[in-house]
Amino acid sequence: LQRQRTVFPLPYYDRDTPLKIEADFWKHDYLFTKENCYTLLFDKEEDMDMVGDTTLTSVQVEWIFLKTRMVKRYYFERKRGMWMLEAINLREMEKGENEDFVEFYTRFVRDSVYQSKHISHPLQFITIDPDDEFSILETTLDVDQWYAFRPVMPTDRLSNINYGQKNEDLSDTKILKVNGIGNGYSNIFYFRKRGKGWELYKYEDTSI
């Protein structure tokens, strides 16, 4: 099925080197389907409404590799009702291209001391009411409570599906949405840039 949904020879850009992948040399790419979860990046809350827009004809799927600062982007176009993979681009993250936030996030998830200094006091916390699963509970957490509640966050790479939402380099807010694959996991992390740099100011856990 994947070969049928791929345009061959497939343009593949390895940094500055343009290549072509013939159908006979294509290896099945699982993207993030073998992962436990995938992530999405947004600048604004309203942009999250773009997910699932059935009118879209173009979507890019990205892997952002935190250690190497590499970005692998898959370009999909919808033609005659079918999504087709039209190109893949592997390149270094450009200066300013979410680089500031990615640099912060990489340290935030790996350095607990740094993390504690970049959490809003108090931290807004939204979750499902344990006494009523149909109600949302809005409360706050202090740093110690955050460490008790915090989930495992991706540390090696982030995925992103670009539905047309803006990911501006100069945006002073970023939203990281982590969706589980077939397990009901759903966490959203809200970051903003203040005088001391980026901070986590809201955490939402609506996992089922």
Regions found by a protein language model. Give the residues of each.
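Surface-exposed, charged secondary-structure patches
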Residues: 8-70, 133-185
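Intrinsically disordered, low-complexity N-terminal regions enriched in serine/proline/glycine
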Residues: 11, 73-74, 113, 124, ...
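Hydrophobic, well-ordered secondary-structure segments
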Residues: 12-14, 124-135, 195-200
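Generic marker of "main functional regions" within proteins
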Residues: 36, 40-42, 115-118, 156, ...
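Short beta-strand edge/turn micro-motifs at domain boundaries
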Residues: 62-96, 184-208
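Surface-exposed beta-loop interaction hotspot
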Residues: 79-117, 122-137
